Amino acid sequence: MTRDLTITAVHLTPILVADPPLLNTQGVHQPYTPRLIVEVETADGVTGVGETYGDAKYLELARPFAAKLVGRQVSDLNGLFTLADEVAVDSSRVFGQVDVGGLRGVQTADKLRLSVVSGFEVACLDALGKALGLPVHALLGGKVRDAVEYSAYLFYKWADHPEGVASEKDDWGAAVDPAGVVAQARAFTERYGFTSFKLKGGVFPPEEEIAAVKALAEAFPGHPLRLDPNGAWSVETSLKVAAELGDVLEYLEDPALGTPAMAEVAAKTGVPLATNMCVTTFAEIQEAFTKGAVQVVLSDHHYWGGLRNTQQLAAVCRTFGVGVSMHSNTHLGISLAAMTHVAATVPDLHHACDSHYPWQSEDVLTERLAFDGGKVAVSDAPGLGVALDRERLAFLHRRWLDDDGTLRDRDDAAAMRVADPEWVTPSVPRW
């Protein structure tokens, strides 16, 4: 039977989801963070779902982009990029701007468009898979593994958000010293079975973070460890940390900011360097690889424009002998399912992927994805293998509607100023 894959409707639902007080070099996570849920409906009544960033700058592009999709085929994945190029980007969103957290370098119109396209591409793949009775990984060429390994994503963390700030309670407790970090790692292991650990650094002086990693190495001997200060260190400091931790680190992630600084660090240490900051588009690959600045690229389908571009990135990395794994920002189950499907198709995935998912107490799915032994099983159900919980989606959307605009754009520095009114985003290198 021929299926009618014509897109008849696209629904965009911005939401606010609870986020714990996780610390980074920019500040602290807000009590709620914005996400955008994308739904694509076909003439046959099939609905596909996707997820991406929900900040205003992405919504401004997603709305006109969604209108252009109606009447097109859900299978026209290449056409998504052509359509995205037709959507104008407000120059104030990109001129001289650095994205929140500085995680992608200088913001560009193309980077904004790719993040929007990623959510729609996943939704189209989900719908196409459901229509054909095939899982997304089959549409991507087939899986090479039945489960994808993830690492425990450790953060320095306050016990609660500042007093007087509306927020959801969590049971993780505080982690502001080596003992707290180790306790957090043990909790991750007990709950989810993780066997590798990543610590978000750039929060405290390097000596304190070195002590935390050494404490992890003592508590979990032989387990892969990573440290990520988000470019907060100078080249000199990066080299000192690498010398101190070289015998326990799997890799050091973005110790210094930018490709030239990373290349200088890489030239003077044997510790592999990973990045999700200086290689976030195809245009940034040549300089980084030519200069030997990175040994592992942490892909993120929200950055790169979707799952198929993620596969292309993995192929380029394989060609140049550069490792590949996956970066994570705050996300829900739709994105974790998408990550798992594409990760299952990448042959040379030699490092556990990152995921914030354990930190998110809320979701929009009828059933949360589960970690078993630190891994997520690859679904063989049609599409992504997930289903929306309409009541939860409506609840989280209502929270977004009720917000006065304060939380509709992620701003870790603004969240920190609630606790410390004198806080300013630190200049880099911070140490």
UniProtKB/Swiss-Prot annotation:
It catalyses: D-glucarate = 5-dehydro-4-deoxy-D-glucarate + H2O. The keyword Lyase applies. SMART domains: MR_MLE (SM00922). The active site is at K200 (proton acceptor), H327 (proton acceptor). This is Probable glucarate dehydratase. Catalyzes the dehydration of glucarate to 5-keto-4-deoxy-D-glucarate (5-kdGluc). Its cofactor is Mg(2+). Belongs to the mandelate racemase/muconate lactonizing enzyme family. GlucD subfamily. Keywords: Lyase, Magnesium, Metal-binding. Mg(2+) binds at D228, N276. It comes from Streptomyces coelicolor (strain ATCC BAA-471 / A3(2) / M145). Pfam families: MR_MLE_C (PF13378), MR_MLE_N (PF02746). Substrate binds at H29, T108, Y153, K198, D228, P229, N230, N276, H327, S328, N329, H356, R410. It is an enzyme of class 4 (lyase). Pathway: Carbohydrate acid metabolism; D-glucarate degradation; 2,5-dioxopentanoate from D-glucarate: step 1/2. One of its GO terms (molecular function) is glucarate dehydratase activity.
